[in-house]
């Protein structure tokens, strides 16, 4: 079982990843593509590295009452299983090919930020916004992924692959070739939008939204999390798009186990309905600024000219030295 101590993952190119996804969808074979970020790191690193500040971070996702040690431990175990079971795992660009001091997570927040800012592939404007706790989560992500026992057959790609699927039109082409689509999302309007746009049958399993943003939607963890598995009753071979935060990675594994093709598309769901939940990604990846503005080309609706002129990714990370 390979280990990548410097996060030197042999990643597929974006076109290779997209082709692998298209093949899995066409073959209707059990499949899971998930993406890992600093939020997943907090849960994966629960046993040995979690701190009170990490629990506070999870409060923003699931609410104060939802973040109990028992609940986090439960999801941590399930998430590890999901990571081991994924066919393709999306890895952040900025942690690749980096070696960090073994004791880094035991240092002060400011010291962690200093090391992360110097060693990780982070753009200067991001460094200026990076908090000590944000830096710690990136360091924790590196620690977790660099010590994980990966499967021999697992493949890796960019954690931004969902945006490439969207911007290149590949996701549209995939949806135009299927008849049934499952959705795991907090956005009830998506089912009808996708059905009308692509002339497909949709089935939706609803999840609560991020607690900090929409507290009235309820707590995702632990209550809803524990009931969702029984609702993932899509037929074998069905393409299921998942955008459900940290628990969504687990749902991808459960879907794969039931014979589905599960793709973690995350914030693509937000873009489809015109919500710019990742404005920094829109700006850094596509050169699009404007706060809450999502460009028309990224939203669901009638077909648009596919010439992606301003949707071509314009940024590739470079190492920044202080």
Name each model-derived stretch:
Residues 1-199:
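Electropositive, gly/pro-rich neighborhoods at or near active sites that engage anionic ligands
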Residues 205-212, 266-271:
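Short, acidic/turn-prone active-site loops that include or flank metal/cofactor-
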Residues 90, 183, 204-207, 264:
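Structural signal for conserved beta-strand scaffold positions within catalytic alpha/beta enzyme cores
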Residues 175-177, 231-239:
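Short, surface-exposed connector motifs at secondary-structure boundaries
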């Amino acid at each position: 079982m390979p280990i990548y101590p410097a996060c030197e993952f042999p990643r597929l190119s974006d076109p290779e990843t997209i082709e692998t996804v298209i093949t899995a969808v066409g073959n209707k074979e059990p499949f899971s593509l998930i993406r890992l970020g600093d939020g997943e790191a907090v849960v994966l690193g629960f046993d040995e590295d979690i701190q009170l500040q990490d629990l506070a971070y999870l409060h923003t996702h699931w609410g104060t009452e939802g973040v109990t040690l028992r609940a986090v431990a439960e999801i941590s175990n399930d998430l590890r299983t999901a990571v081991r079971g994924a066919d393709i795992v999306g890895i952040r660009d900025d942690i690749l090919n980096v070696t960090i001091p073994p004791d880094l997570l035991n240092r002060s927040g400011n010291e962690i930020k200093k090391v992360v800012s110097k060693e990780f592939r982070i753009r200067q404007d991001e460094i200026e916004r990076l908090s000590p706790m944000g830096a710690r989560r990136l360091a924790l992500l590196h620690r977790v992924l660099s010590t994980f026992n990966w499967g021999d057959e697992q493949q890796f790609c960019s954690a931004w692959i969902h945006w490439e699927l969207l911007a290149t039109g590949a996701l549209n082409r995939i949806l135009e070739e299927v008849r049934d689509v499952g959705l795991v999302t907090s956005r009830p309007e998506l089912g009808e939008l996708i059905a009308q746009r692509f002339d497909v049958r949709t089935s939706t399993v609803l999840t609560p939204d991020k607690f900090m943003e929409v507290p009235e939607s309820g707590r995702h963890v632990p209550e809803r999390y524990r009931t969702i598995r029984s609702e993932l009753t899509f037929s074998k071979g069905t393409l299921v798009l998942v955008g459900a935060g940290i628990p969504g990675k687990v749902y991808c594994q459960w879907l794969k186990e039931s014979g589905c093709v599960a793709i973690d598309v995350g914030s693509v769901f937000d873009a489809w309905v015109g919500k710019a939940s990742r404005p920094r990604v829109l700006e850094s990846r596509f050169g699009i600024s404007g706060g809450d503005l999502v460009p028309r080309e990224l939203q669901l609706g009638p077909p648009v000219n596919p010439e992606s002129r301003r949707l071509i990714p314009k940024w590739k990370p470079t190492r920044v030295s202080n």
